[in-house]
Regions:
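A cross-kingdom feature that marks ATP-driven nucleic-acid transaction machinery
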Residues: 1-106
Length: 106
């Protein structure tokens, strides 16, 4: 049934985003803090910027680790990829899953 999808929805969504990033020629990295349980799903570096990326499989998009990472690294702007529409906040942008290619090709 749907139990497998429900249980692994986050992992499937992260895998989809990873495949999209690789298809765009980007080289994503993973980051975790050894002192706390925080993690950033992907760190992308292109010619102009470093982008910490948090992937959310649902519309419940609290991104505490991303917020803390941005707080600890002033000057960076985070990217959250989720099922929600586009939102631009001072510290982070949210883009829908279907807009990954468009976002990085600009």
């Amino acid at each position: 049934g749907d139990n497998v999808f429900t249980e692994f929805k986050g992992a499937f969504t992260e895998q989809y985003v990873l495949q999209q990033l690789l298809a765009l020629g980007l080289k994503p990295y993973y980051w975790s803090n050894t002192k706390t349980p925080s993690e950033i799903d992907f760190i992308i570096q292109d010619s102009q910027r470093v982008i910490p990326v948090e992937v959310k499989a649902e519309e419940n998009v609290r991104a505490k680790s991303l917020a803390q990472f941005i707080k600890d690294n002033p000057g960076l702007k985070g990217l959250r990829i989720s099922m929600k529409g586009y939102v631009d906040q001072e510290w982070m942008e949210n883009i829908p899953l279907i807009a990954i290619g468009t976002y990085f090709e600009r």
